Amino acid sequence: MIGERIYKVLLGPHISEKATIVAEGNGQYVFRVTGDATKPEIKQAIEALFEVKVESVRTLNHKGKTKRTVRGLGKRKDVKKAYVRLAEGQDIDFMVAE
């Protein structure tokens, strides 16, 4: 993968109640990724940026809701999420500041 593409694939971690439960129980982490990202690209990006071993990647496309506004109907953004399972004994700490 081209070095510049690594930084564009991952948009950031997806923090939610479900993501926290999955991280504690199964060693999975949830990331928001670009819509055109593939599973091998996501795996390479996470292994390069966080220096961990990725076991598997599952993705889902979450369609944005249609909402009513003063000017009519509007639509929220579509989001692609990646559920990443790390190898046994590996973890990612998002709170570390170096």
Curated annotation (Swiss-Prot):
Pfam families: Ribosomal_L23 (PF00276). One of its GO terms (biological process) is translation. Keywords: Ribonucleoprotein, Ribosomal protein, RNA-binding, rRNA-binding. Coiled coil: none annotated. The keyword rRNA-binding applies. It comes from the Bacteria. GO terms for molecular function: rRNA binding; structural constituent of ribosome. One of the early assembly proteins it binds 23S rRNA. One of the proteins that surrounds the polypeptide exit tunnel on the outside of the ribosome. Forms the main docking site for trigger factor binding to the ribosome. Belongs to the universal ribosomal protein uL23 family. PANTHER family: 60S RIBOSOMAL PROTEIN L23A. Part of the 50S ribosomal subunit. Contacts protein L29, and trigger factor when it is bound to the ribosome. This is Large ribosomal subunit protein uL23. It comes from Marinomonas sp. (strain MWYL1). The lineage of its organism: Bacteria, Pseudomonadati, Pseudomonadota, Gammaproteobacteria, Oceanospirillales. The gene is rplW.
